[in-house]
Regions:
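Active-site-adjacent loops and short helices of periplasmic peptidoglycan-processing enzymes
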Residues: 17-145, 149-158
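Enrichment for repetitive, rod-forming helical segments
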Residues: 10-11, 60, 240
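Sec-dependent N-terminal signal peptides
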Residues: 4-13
Length: 244
């Protein structure tokens, strides 16, 4: 009985602590089964910025297009494969990479956007709408509750899991020059194991991040929307993953 009471008090204290220290307008933490452990404003529809790129990557992978195909249009003065564009979209959150993935989707850009919304419906993300592949438009919206479904779906794609754990995208552009783009989640590459990681920011959305991470308490999925800025979102998400 005493242990149960202590557990209840600890959980209540944790909830109050999180509410007092977070700048995020909506958030939640879920366990390995998707059971929500704690959250706030989970059903509030909000702009999700570059979290959108997870959906872009998924529909491109669903299409069955060759990952080794070189895309005709250049990025960083180089023709890149579809796989590298996916890496750039997830790791660097590169808008041009995400745009190109959609532009070269079967049927073109509009078919890509349609596929993103159809995928959302298939995942029962009933409060989510996608209007562009990058997240630059504030009309890409979802809820913390819907994004749990997105993260769990993304975790079943090996390439997304791989990219989520890359601290940077690197390649040689000449014998003497390398190019490197760091992961927008600064936790990656510092001893943490991620199944999914994606950040986002536009003024309308605020600082955003979704991540599925292996913690001392087990697998935790964190969705955080509307944080004050790009500097607050990651510490807040890290705190939530450790708190619950």
């Amino acid at each position: 009985m005493i242990k149960k009471l202590i557990a209840i008090l600890t959980l209540a204290t944790s909830s109050v602590y999180a509410d007092q220290t977070l700048t995020a307008q909506a958030w939640l933490v879920a366990d390995h089964n998707g059971k929500i452990l704690e959250g706030s404003n989970m059903s509030e529809v909000r702009s999700i910025a570059s979290i959108t790129k997870l959906m872009t990557a998924m529909v491109v992978l669903d299409s069955g297009q060759s990952l080794t195909e070189i895309i005709p249009k250049k990025l960083y003065n180089k023709q890149l494969t579809r796989e590298i564009l996916i890496d750039l979209a997830i790791v660097k959150s590169d808008n041009n990479a995400a745009q190109m993935l959609c532009d070269y989707y079967p049927g073109g850009y509009n078919s890509c956007i349609e596929a993103m919304n159809q995928k959302a419906l298939a995942l029962q993300m009933i409060n989510s709408t996608f209007t562009d592949p990058t997240g630059r438009m504030h009309t890409n919206v979802s809820t913390a509750h819907d994004l749990i479904k997105l993260v769990f779906a993304a975790s079943t794609y090996p390439l997304i899991v791989q990219a989520s754990n890359m601290d940077a995208v690197r390649w040689n552009i000449s014998k003497k020059k390398n190019i490197e783009f760091r992961n927008t989640n600064s936790l990656v590459g510092h001893g943490y194991k991620f199944l999914v990681s994606k950040t986002g920011f536009i003024n309308k959305a605020g600082g955003c991040i979704v991540m599925m991470i292996d913690t001392a308490n087990g697998i935790r999925t964190v969705v955080l929307l509307g944080s004050k800025n790009t500097k607050t979102r990651i510490p807040e998400a890290k705190m939530l993953s450790m708190l619950y």
